[in-house]
Amino acid sequence: MRFLLQIGWIARNFVYRVLKVRTRGAKAMVFTGKGELLLIRNSYGATHLFVLPGGGIGRRETPEDAAAREVREETGLEVRELRFVGCFANDGEGKRDTIHLFTARADGEPKIDAFEIAEAGFFALDALPDSVSGATRRRIAEYCSGAEPAGRW
């Protein structure tokens, strides 16, 4: 079944490249009370990389609602204290994407369905996995240093 998910992801990205699709997405940097950060590893695409939870914004959905929904769908966690960080342009995956990034808080352990998400967990900022994506590392560094967010993902 994951094979079909991977094929679908490849086909979707091909269509994005051909049609130059514009999309909107939302991601969240979700922290525990101890300051640990939630990271996920998808079961499609770059399956070896840890990234922030997130996904597309629905037609009648706010970016905040989309970020909370994506965290809930991908990890089973309910977020609180959702705060806007910034918007980023992203032309990865062949599309022209605007990513809305938020910080949030959550308690509990992530529960994944093991279909879309291969792995999820909270990590101390000084003990992140080696396989964190470059864009995710940049967002973490900006957050930790208090720097203004870059305009590109």
For each feature predicted by the language model, list its residue ranges.
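Conserved beta-strand and immediately adjacent loop positions that scaffold enzyme active sites
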Residues: 27, 36, 119
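Acidic, metal-coordinating catalytic segment for phosphate/diphosphate chemistry
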Residues: 1-27
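Anionic group-transfer/hydrolysis microenvironments
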Residues: 29, 43, 126
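Unchanged
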Residues: 57-80, 86-144, 149-153
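Conserved hydrophobic "DFG−1" position in protein kinase catalytic cores
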Residues: 30-31, 39, 104, 122
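A short catalytic or substrate-binding loop motif that flags glycine-/basic-rich loops and adjacent residues
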Residues: 20-22, 31, 94
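Conserved Nudix-box catalytic region and its N-terminal flanking loop in Nudix hydrolases
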Residues: 32, 36-73
